[in-house]
Amino acid sequence: MGREFLDVFTGWAESYDSFVQGQDAEYKEVFRRYDEILDEIVKRSGENVLEFGIGTGNLTKLLFDSNKQVFPIEPSPEMRLIASKKLGENVDIHDGDLIDFPKPTQQIDTIVSSYVFHHLTDDEKYEAIKLYHSLLPVNGKIIFADTMFQTEEAFQNEITKADQANFIDLRDDLKREYYPLIPVIRSHFEKNGFSVSFQQFNDFVWIVEATKL
């Protein structure tokens, strides 16, 4: 359910915001257009939002600033601490992951995340989407930004490029986590009663927008 990667975020929490602003050469392309990606998620979101893996709270803050109601979920204590400082003491950040989480107390119309869904295996992604379908009303949306690839060949090419550039952390990251292929994700959503579209924002990251039918 993604919690096997918590140790990564224990060490990354303090420096995460510098990473997303492109200050690390290895991840510069991964986070290119980061602010635009978050703004796009906010623009597509409804009024009552469940957010998974809020990290240091960057997307959460933008959602609140746009007068959305947000139910934030984050499994990392270190990330929750930083996010709390950014969002203020009045915001309750709930301990949970993409599958095991406290349920919102009011009806949500949108589920969002940024750079999170790849922590689940393909089978777990399917189960998560099935669960989210049960939480959303008709026309409710799932809006995820994440690294994903159109083909296995494209995925392997990025690993090769990272290796050739001596981007060891990026290479190992690509090999370690469960970055999805778009045809697989498309099938998962469609089999669970969603229409779905994809938009690419850099060499790695796409926004997937799924609407419950």
State the predicted function of each range.
Residues Y115-H119:
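Short catalytic micro-motifs in class I SAM-dependent methyltransferases
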Residues M1-R44, G46-G55:
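Conserved class I S-adenosyl-L-methionine
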Residues G55-D100:
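Class I SAM-dependent methyltransferase SAM/SAH-binding core
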